[in-house]
Amino acid sequence: MNVLTAPIKNDTWTEATWEEFIQATENPDYQRGKFYYYQNQLRIELSPISSDHAHDHSTILGGIHLYLATHDLNVAIKDNCSYRKADKQEAQPDISCYVGNNADVIPSGTGIVNLNDYPPPDLVIEIANISLADDQGKNGYFMKS
């Protein structure tokens, strides 16, 4: 296994093997980060959550809950859940939802959702502030693969 010796640049796509990515996710220096892996590149977002992002996040979640309170839908909402396809990809969208028959597909007690075992969410929401280009680019393509 390769050993990452240099610090990983924040909010930048960096060439890395899957093993280096896993090593970074286990590094205590990055424990507060959001991790992404796509096409042999990793990205760690260590940015603090801004007031605007927190407001938008809670507003969107509130809207989802309000909609669900007035409609008969079976939905499981995941807040900042990690989705992993081993040796290929990982992402942590701000909000994700499993709808209908998929609502109960992820059992309680599941940590990182293994996309080799479970389907991807039916709805993924990434709240963009300064990261809009990434959210529409590599981050956005993750769930489509």
Q: Language-model features: where?
A:
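Gly/Pro/Ser/Thr-rich low-complexity, intrinsically disordered segments predominantly at protein N-termini
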Residues: 1-144
